Amino acid sequence: MSFPKVIVVSTGSELTAGRSQDTNSSWIANELFGMGFTVSKFVVLPDDPVVILEELRTLTELSMRETSILLVMTGGLGPTEDDYTLEAVCRLKGVTTEESPVARQRIETFYKLRGRNFQEAMQTAIRQVFVPKGSIILNNSVGIAPGFITSLAENVHLGCMPGVPGEMTEMFREELAPWILKTYSSRELYSGFRFIWWMSESQFQKEFISKEKAIADGKAIWGVAAKRGYIRASFQSDSRALVDDLLRKLDTFYGTKSTPDIFEELPRMLLEKKITIGTAESCTGGLIAKTFTDVPGSSAYFYGGIISYDNSVKTGILGVKRNTLDEFGAVSRETAKEMAEGALDALGVDYSISVTGIAGPGGGTPQKKVGLVYFGIGQKNEETEIHEHYFPFPRSSFREFAAHTGIYLLYDRLKRSA
């Protein structure tokens, strides 16, 4: 089948009301991008059967102008009365439903293990086991509700998955993605990315993208996503050599500010080199430690973190001198240095990260403004490095900028020490 126009549809009144973010669509688009497919449109719909039906009908009518259309839809397959996707698809196709035997068995097992009578939940939970008649069933290895693939017209295919992110991601990778690759003639595309630290999207476009002839000529597609403390710059082309060349140019142009995904690379480095680390955090309140311990297996290298929010913890546990606090203040190079060195001793680790700053909105002075932050990167038997940064952002954003920067600074020191 020819290369399709791809449209991603998300349903949920919590999305259209702004109470939740649609993370599913961006995740799906990124996966499809890596498979060689580019999303041309995103659609977000409320839990309204009329709206869902009309939008699917409108999208299907695009088939008269397109060679092939692939709709990837999430949400509306659960047990509650506001789950309307199945109903809308069946009405559009003029078909009834049929039961997924696998889903039926999973839901019966689910209730039996919890000591509940399956019949008591029949009126609501049973809704999850049905798909449009004649569909290809997408099994749910995480939850209960199956997804399905069905045709809405000769050249329009619809793949529906649950809206729960954990269920959706597994179903996409295990069930839907293999079907897409088998069904459509995808272009063989190559992609790559880098994190560029302390960089804005507009600055990146001005000083790098605008000067690349291959991008101007349409030989490569580029994308950029702003994160807290860095941007993620990506390239895609049917030429592997061109993608590799763009990445090399990035590394040359930005130097140590250009990195791979350090949140994946740093744990690998720590495990490989058998390095242990710990943290001493003030203004980030343990966010750096959380980021490390979110990774499975982090106990092999992360020994612990000390949240020294109050000065008494800085002096009592980390050994920061009272004279240092009195003379230079809690937010200072000197305090960051003693915090990092105190963490090395208190936790018995090879490397440490310390951070102390003014998250705001109060606490700033003309000499030390809100957003000022100091980092210490300690290394056993080596000189502690101190770094000063300024992140004049709201409190939550400041904390993320600071946490990500602290992790980057450790990564950078390890790379230089290799």
Curated annotation (Swiss-Prot):
Instruction: Report the InterPro entries cross-referenced here.
Output: CinA, CinA-like_C, CinA_C, Competence-induced_CinA, MoaB/Mog-like_dom_sf, MoaB/Mog_dom
Q: Which SMART domains match?
A: MoCF_biosynth (SM00852)
Please report the name of this protein according to its UniProt entry.
CinA-like protein
Q: Which organism is it from?
A: Leptospira borgpetersenii serovar Hardjo-bovis (strain L550)
Record family assignment = Belongs to the CinA family.
Q: Give the highest taxon in the source lineage.
A: Bacteria
A Pfam family of this chain: CinA
